[in-house]
């Protein structure tokens, strides 16, 4: 069976891993997934990540917990293959009144809603993380 939405699969693996208190989760690697994971690490939502394998690359995401609770409270897919959600620079969403982040795919790459607003860019809203 082919995977219809690899990003949603990645977010679900992270969500399920944290609800089961796993140390890490593994998933197939792609440039988009790598960019999103890199952004999650930079924003402090995951501890670290590793790329594994030779011909079939996999990403191992090391999950982050604080006092026994997962750092990621919610991680939700917004734009999906069947319904793409695009926002202009003036209409970029804020997550939990600025406490969370929205991950945006812009013409200059994957970035948070704050950085896109600062650069004056709009784009596709990939997901919300809080």
Curated annotation (Swiss-Prot):
CC per GO annotation: ribonucleoprotein complex; ribosome
Per UniProt, the keywords (alphabetical) are:
Ribonucleoprotein, Ribosomal protein, RNA-binding, rRNA-binding
- Molecular function in Gene Ontology: rRNA binding; structural constituent of ribosome
**Family matches, as InterPro entries:** Ribosomal_uS8, Ribosomal_uS8_CS, Ribosomal_uS8_sf
- What domain of life does the UniProt record list for this protein's source? Bacteria
GO BP of this protein: translation
Q: Which residues form the signal peptide?
A: none
Q: Which residues form a coiled coil?
A: none
- Tell me which PANTHER family the record gives: 40S RIBOSOMAL PROTEIN S15A
Q: How does it assemble?
A: Part of the 30S ribosomal subunit. Contacts proteins S5 and S12.
Task: Identify the HAMAP family for this entry.
Answer: Ribosomal_uS8_B
The entry's family comment says:
Belongs to the universal ribosomal protein uS8 family.
Give the function comment from the record.
Answer: One of the primary rRNA binding proteins, it binds directly to 16S rRNA central domain where it helps coordinate assembly of the platform of the 30S subunit.
Protein name stated in the entry:
Small ribosomal subunit protein uS8
Recorded source organism is Buchnera aphidicola subsp. Schizaphis graminum (strain Sg)
């Amino acid at each position: 069976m082919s995977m219809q939405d690899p990003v949603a699969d990645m977010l679900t693996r992270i969500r399920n891993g944290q609800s089961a208190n796993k140390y890490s989760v593994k998933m197939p690697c792609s440039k988009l997934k790598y960019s999103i994971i890199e952004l999650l690490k930079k924003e402090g939502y995951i501890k670290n990540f590793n790329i594994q394998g030779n011909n079939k690359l996999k990403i191992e995401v090391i999950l982050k917990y604080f006092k026994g609770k997962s750092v990621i409270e919610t991680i939700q897919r917004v734009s999906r293959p069947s319904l793409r959600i695009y926002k202009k620079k003036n209409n970029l969403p804020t997550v939990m009144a600025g406490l969370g982040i929205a991950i945006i795919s812009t013409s200059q790459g994957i970035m948070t809603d704050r950085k896109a607003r600062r650069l004056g860019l709009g784009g596709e809203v990939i997901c919300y993380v809080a």
